Amino acid sequence: MVYTFEYLQHFNINKPPKSSKLISRTKDMHEKYLKYKPNQLNLMLELFSNGNLYTIKLALFPYDIENNVQHYILWFSPFLKYKLYNDKNYIKKIINIHFKNKNTVYFMNYHKNRSINKIPHYHIFVKN
């Protein structure tokens, strides 16, 4: 099922998808993801070896979204305090800096729906 931006707008930082079945990858993309699914320690080193507190990357294995929407991941250093990466104003500020004047939807999956749970991260969807 291809998810439209309008569908994605049902979710936000206060209301992430309750189930991983509400938004998912294509079967092919999911299989590629499972083959790649990184060692979380290696991923941490890859993302944060430069000492940054956060980084934004285009999703390597995006959800099944329409072509006019891009899927990014906002990764936070796992060494940050819980309070900071859960500060909604801080998250909004980061999103506004990087995607100024763009139509965005963003959320962090519930813990039970995270496949990478040792590195705090938000899904960001940007409509072109």
What are these regions (language model features)?
Residues 1-128:
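HIT superfamily nucleotide-processing domains
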